[in-house]
From Swiss-Prot:
The organism of origin for this protein: Oryza sativa subsp. japonica
Record protein name field: Transcription factor BHLH156
Region of interest (Basic motif), residue spans: 130-143
Claim: rRNA processing is one of the keywords in the record: no
Region (Helix-loop-helix motif) residue spans: 144-179
Top-rank lineage group of the source organism: Eukaryota
Family: Belongs to the bHLH protein family.
Function: Transcription factor involved in positive regulation of genes involved in strategy II iron acquisition, including genes for mugineic acid (MA) family phytosiderophores biosynthesis, and genes involved in S-adenosylmethionine cycle and iron transport. May play a role in the regulation of iron deficiency response by promoting the nuclear localization of IRO2. Possesses transactivation activity in yeast.
Disruption phenotype: No visible phenotype under normal growth conditions, but mutant plants exhibit impaired growth, leaf chlorosis and reduced iron concentration in shoots, when grown under iron deficiency conditions.
Residues in bHLH domain copies: 130-179
Stored PANTHER family: TRANSCRIPTION FACTOR FER-LIKE IRON DEFICIENCY-INDUCED TRANSCRIPTION FACTOR, TRANSCRIPTION FACTOR SCREAM2-RELATED
Length: 352
């Protein structure tokens, strides 16, 4: 910048035609001897000062013109070399900066090229940082998942010696091997027990035994009913003062070993005038006489012409096979008990 100021001080009064700055500085008109002669003798001092700045010597006093020409010529060559170093081979848009360059065209690049280069570098650096961030995030997620799995494994294994990852995995491996060995041992014991157990024929099921027992019970109840009917036929009216007739006997199974029994009787004329109260007691006494049943509940409803008794019977615990007692067997047993108490069967009695 100091060189430019010194050159501008030596410019002639009439301004030259407009030219680029580089051509203006190197124009020969600046070193015209006639022009300097008009200015005065101060131009020699200025020229010598420029020669010292550019390393150019000025001629002696014997040959002023030759010295001036030689000095100017040497200065012109040095100026040309300096201009070439400053201008370079590129266009003004890509002109390198002057000053610290060493004359080989390797000076600082222009701001535009620098900006482009910095942009490319920034993009590459940003891309690298983004890839590195993705890698770090993925690795962090993988470690979090691994840590969660290790926590779950530590909760399942009962004997954990240490809390570090290697100890947790080693203890889990030992625990799984122990479980496998225990399972093999149990299988061997089961196989040995199966071989030592004697083979026995399966016992007959209750369903298979029921058809054999039930006919015998039904036959026994029928025989008992026949005997009770024969005894009732020879009984006199004095032996049965109520003189009631059995109109209907019904039974329904309401659970295992439990039956719902209904008895309908038609009282005689004397018992009907008394409201049927003399028939309810013999009905309950007849049912209670059955030793294989227990009366859980009973209800008696009386009307002038009919007495209806409803009872809930449960098979006693003394009976071995409760499933062998059917509804038909219960009806026959209740009917036989009523006949023993002096009830007379109607010709159209219903047993259902």
């Amino acid at each position: 910048m100091e060189h430019h100021h010194l050159l501008l001080q030596l410019s002639p009064p009439p301004p030259p035609p407009p030219l680029p700055a580089a051509h203006l500085m190197m124009s020969p008109s600046f070193f015209d001897a006639g022009v300097f002669a008009d200015v005065g003798g101060d131009w020699m001092e200025d020229l010598m000062h420029l020669g010292e700045l550019f390393g150019v010597g000025v001629g002696g006093d014997d040959d002023d013109n030759g010295g001036v020409d030689g000095g100017v010529g040497g200065g012109d060559d040095r100026m040309q070399e300096w201009q070439n170093n400053c201008e370079g081979a590129g266009s003004p848009d890509h002109q390198p900066s002057c000053g610290d360059g060493d004359g080989d065209g390797d000076g600082d690049v222009s701001p535009r090229d620098g900006e482009l280069g910095d942009g490319d570098g920034d993009n590459s650096a940003t891309r690298k940082r983004r890839d590195r961030s993705k890698t770090i995030v993925s690795e962090r997620k993988r470690r979090v998942r691994m840590k969660e799995k290790l926590y779950e494994l530590r909760a399942l294994v009962p004997n954990i010696t240490k809390m570090d990852k290697a100890s947790i995995i080693a203890d889990a491996v030992v625990y799984v091997k122990d479980l496998q060995a225990h399972a093999r041992k149990l299988k061997e014991e089961v196989a040995a027990l199966e071989e030592a157990r004697p083979i026995r024929p399966p016992p007959p099921s209750a369903a298979a035994q029921r058809p054999q027992r039930q006919p015998r019970r039904v036959a026994a109840a029928a025989a008992q009913l026949a005997r009770a009917a024969d005894a009732a036929a020879v009984t006199t009216a004095a032996a049965a003062p109520h003189g009631a007739r059995v109109a209907h006997v019904g039974a329904a199974q309401v659970g295992e070993g439990r039956f719902f029994v209904t008895v309908e009787c038609e009282p005689a004329a004397a018992a009907a005038r008394g409201g049927g109260g003399g028939v309810a007691a013999p009905v309950c006494a007849a049912v209670e006489s059955l030793s294989c049943f227990t009366v859980e509940s009973s209800t008696v409803g009386c009307s002038p012409d009919r007495v209806v008794a409803t009872l809930t019977l449960k098979v006693s615990e003394a009976e071995e096979d409760v499933s062998a007692i059917s509804e038909c067997t219960v009806k026959l047993w209740v009917m036989a008990a009523l006949l023993k108490e002096g009830f007379r069967p109607q010709p159209t009695v219903q047993i259902s």
